């Protein structure tokens, strides 16, 4: 035992990296395959790369609102390892590894080794293996998870450049930032923070900055070049850009952006006040419990109580004000902060602009909040002076460890509970999935019916969305309208949706309700008054309806 302890002391960084890698693999093996809500965005991430490998061109033959690198990455993995759920999960493993090791590299430059390790383990459980649509094994968007992972890698390389002055690290940072941009466009704004370093904080020569810009452009140029090689035209690019503009300014999208913190609205003030109240209760109660612990046994009990408090104080909102706090911290303490910390704060703010007015531990926050949490800890550690609450820096460190332990315990219980709900197996040629029983039964019924009465390559449509069924059955959607949820419905236009349904000549059309599908503050889209549904009912025969709880699938078949 002493040999192990001594080895850990001598090789702490190496051991911590090994621990993170082992925990990543164990968590991946334990949680993979168990998902809920696969009728939502999951399907898009499954089917688009398959369509690309079948000769369809993104933005030309496939209606897409996201940047291409994530889909190109998965398409490459399909080519290497086969088109399957396992390959998608393997992509997730690679992305999680980059994500958590990059985060650890950043943390280790500022924080105690124990804090850095515990923070990354907590993030691994809370974000990597999250029991919702916004996990990182099979996420709502590979482009987002790949992009944020490259963004964190970029930040890590810049921090290490500050320490070592090795310019190749900065080249790597610009390269990674370019990859983040090619995967998720908004993450390219990180370039502003890196330019602050190369031009001001730690200036490079003109020649080096030229290389920096070349490195940034490499992935975007290669990604776009591949599309052009496949046949995309300048006109296609402009058409795709125009559709993205329309899509992201629809009524439903603006509602969604406001709800997820992208826009400040007065209607959110009650939520802000509630969050402040709940955060205050949690922090005061947790500090009281922390201050009363006298040994490890009482500390474990106290951590368990704090983890329970996370549930009753709506912990999803505990991170709500992080971007605003970082801005305030930067303004108030900029003169006493090192250039590395200033860069870190700017980077964390930029990466959380999408949820600036309400960074919640939900949806996109699972991906972007970790860097903000890390940065806040670094900022507080730098500016907190000795006081009654924290007589020494070590007291503050212990309290951080206490809080992280509570969050880690809470999310571990949450993830395992969600996994237990996803307990109903169904098998397809693409792999095995475990879903909640109320979702698995209707989906399984639809899949078996499709496989029995259609052939591979024939077209089916699932409304409002459900391209996972297309992927699992090898029945293609129409690339020009693979889905038509409320966002796409508003962006495409009702008449065009109806025209696409008429021209695509589907063998079957499925209307789904429930399955975690969101309606963006409005009523269910495909009700009896919907013109598109009326058209489908006039041209197709309703063959069957299957319902399990709130989850319903209506099957319409082409008459013969």
Which stretches of residues belong to each language-model region?
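Short hydrophobic alpha-helices at membrane interfaces in multi-pass membrane enzymes
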Residues: 157-179, 206-217, 296-304, 338-348
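Transmembrane-helix motifs of polytopic, lipid-linked glycan transferases
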Residues: 90-114, 124-129, 153-156, 282-290
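Short periplasmic/luminal acceptor-recognition loop of GT-C membrane glycosyltransferases, typified by
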Residues: 416-488, 495-520, 547-556
């Amino acid at each position: 035992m002493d040999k192990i302890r001594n080895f850990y002391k001598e090789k702490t960084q190496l051991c911590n990296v090994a621990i993170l890698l082992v925990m990543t693999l164990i968590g991946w093996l334990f949680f993979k395959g168990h998902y809920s809500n696969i009728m939502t965005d999951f399907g898009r991430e499954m089917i688009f790369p398959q369509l690309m490998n079948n000769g369809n061109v993104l933005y030309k033959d496939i209606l897409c609102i996201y940047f291409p690198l994530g889909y190109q990455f998965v398409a490459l993995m399909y080519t290497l390892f086969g088109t399957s759920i396992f390959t998608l999960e393997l992509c997730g493993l690679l992305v999680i590894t980059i994500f958590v090791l990059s985060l650890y590299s950043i943390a280790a430059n500022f924080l105690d080794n124990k804090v850095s390790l515990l923070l990354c383990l907590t993030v691994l459980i809370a974000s990597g293996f999250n029991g919702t649509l916004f996990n990182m094994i099979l996420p709502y968007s590979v482009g987002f998870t790949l992009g944020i992972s490259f963004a964190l890698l970029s930040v890590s390389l810049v921090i290490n450049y500050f320490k070592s002055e090795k310019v190749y690290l900065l080249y790597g940072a610009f390269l990674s930032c370019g990859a983040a941009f090619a995967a998720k466009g908004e993450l390219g704004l990180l370039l502003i923070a890196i330019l602050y370093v190369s031009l001001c904080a730690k200036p490079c020569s003109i020649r080096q900055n030229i290389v920096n810009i070349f490195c940034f452009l490499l992935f975007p140029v290669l990604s776009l070049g591949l599309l052009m090689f496949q046949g995309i035209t300048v006109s296609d690019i402009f058409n795709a850009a125009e559709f993205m503009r329309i899509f992201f300014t629809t009524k439903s999208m603006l509602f969604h952006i406001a709800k997820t913190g992208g826009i400040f609205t007065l209607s959110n003030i009650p939520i802000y006040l509630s969050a402040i109240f709940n955060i205050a209760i949690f922090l005061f109660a947790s500090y009281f419990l922390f201050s009363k612990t006298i040994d490890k046994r009482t500390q474990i009990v106290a951590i368990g109580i704090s983890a329970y408090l996370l549930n009753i104080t709506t912990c999803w909102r505990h991170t709500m004000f992080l971007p605003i706090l970082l801005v305030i911290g930067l303004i108030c303490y900029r003169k006493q902060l090192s250039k590395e910390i200033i860069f870190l704060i700017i980077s964390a703010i930029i990466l959380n602009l999408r949820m600036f007015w309400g960074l919640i531990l939900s949806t996109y926050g699972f991906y972007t909040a970790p860097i903000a949490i890390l940065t806040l800890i670094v900022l507080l550690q730098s500016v907190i002076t000795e006081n009654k609450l924290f007589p020494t820096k070590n007291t503050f460190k212990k309290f951080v460890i206490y809080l992280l332990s509570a969050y880690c315990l809470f999310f571990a219980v949450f993830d395992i509970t969600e996994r237990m709900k996803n307990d109903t197996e169904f098998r397809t040629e693409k792999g095995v999935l475990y879903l909640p029983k109320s979702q698995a039964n209707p989906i399984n019924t639809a899949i078996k019916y499709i496989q029995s009465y259609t052939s591979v390559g024939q077209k089916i449509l699932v409304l409002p969305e459900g391209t996972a069924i297309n992927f699992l059955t090898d029945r293609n959607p129409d690339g020009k309208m693979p889905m038509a949820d409320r966002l796409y419905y508003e962006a495409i236009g009702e008449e065009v949706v109806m025209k696409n349904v008429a021209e695509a000549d589907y063998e079957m059309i499925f209307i789904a309700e429930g399955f975690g599908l969101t309606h963006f503050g409005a009523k269910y889209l495909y009700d009896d008054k919907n013109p598109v549904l009326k058209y489908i009912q006039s041209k197709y025969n309703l063959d069957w309806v299957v319902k399990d709880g709130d989850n319903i699938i209506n099957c319409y078949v082409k008459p013969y």
